[in-house]
C-alpha cells in the first residue's frame, strides 16, 4: 500500500514539475528555395514577465542549432500561441529536425521531432 501511494505522489510531483515547462503542440514546415520556414505552436502557463516561454529553436538531432526564435514578451492571455521563423538553412540530406521550446525559469522543454518533406 505504501509503495502504491509513494509511486502516485512521485508521479504527480513529476507531472507538476513538467507542467511548468513549455510544450510544442504543432509544427508546420515549408521549404522555399534553399531555406525552410517553421511555424511552431507552443503551450505554456505564462504568468507574466517573471515566468514565460521566451523562445524556441530548430536543431539537428545531434544538437546543432540551425535557428532560434526569441519570444520577446509573455503570452498570458494567448495560449497556445504560434510564431514563425524563416530563412532556416537545413543541410542537404537532413530529413529530421527537432524543435525545442524554452522558458525563462526552467530552461528547455521536451523536443518535438519534425520530419521534413
Q: PLM features: residue spans?
A:
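Bacterial N-terminal signal peptides that target proteins for export
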Residues: 1-6
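Short, surface-exposed binding/anchoring microloops in extracellular/periplasmic proteins
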Residues: 20-53
